[in-house]
Swiss-Prot record:
Organism from which the protein derives: Planktothrix agardhii (Oscillatoria agardhii)
Physiological role: Confers stability, involved in shaping gas vesicles, hollow, gas filled proteinaceous nanostructures. During planktonic growth they allow positioning of the organism at a favorable depth for light or nutrient acquisition.
Residue span of region 5 X 33 AA tandem repeats: 18-207
Origin: domain of life: Bacteria
UniProt protein name: Gas vesicle protein C
Entry similarity comment: Belongs to the gas vesicle GvpC family.
Amino acid sequence: MALKDKWQQDRIGRQQGVQERQQQVQTTLSLWQQERQNQALDDQESRQGFVTGVQQQTQELLTNISTERLWVAQQQREQLENFIQQLSQEVGEFLQQTIEERSQVAAQLHQQLSEFREDLEYRVTDLLANYQKQRLEARETLLEDLAIFRQTLYREVEEYLGELDILHQQMAAQLQQQLQQSRTERKDAVQKLFEDLGVFRAELQDYHLKLQQTVWGSSHRKPRKAITPQRSIPSRLYSC
């Protein structure tokens, strides 16, 4: 075989070897690209499944928190209504008892005044009878005794009326103090309830924000906090 033919044959063999290696490289690259595409699809499906699971768990957690918050609010509202009802009942019973005591005092006073008037009429009648009998004998002495009796009677009546006025003022002051104390205690209880609700709302918002940061990370835009207007305590709860 001539040298040229041999060189030509070797050249063709080298070209075929190069083509085979190029084909192998192309096949290997195609396989790698297909594997990378499949892996990317698998990773995308895994991420989508993870995000869907996290969203579902977050929604369930928020639903449970909302349900629990509504239940707690319902329980606290029932407790507050029971407290107000019990306090109103106690105040009504106290007022009824005070009215009955005042009625008893008035009845006793009326009876005492009636007895005093009867006794006074009797004493005046007896005094007038004695006065008519002893008029000529002891006019000056009788008039002096009558003046002393009148002064004593006036003083006793004034003292008795003063005692009644003091008793009435003491009862009114005691009733006012008890009503003021009940109103203050009820106000403190309602204020404490709303403060607890405010703390619970702040803790819930903080927990929700931390949960969003945990799920979405710090790269996502943080949601704006909902501004809840401060609720004022109804004045009707303080004025019973």
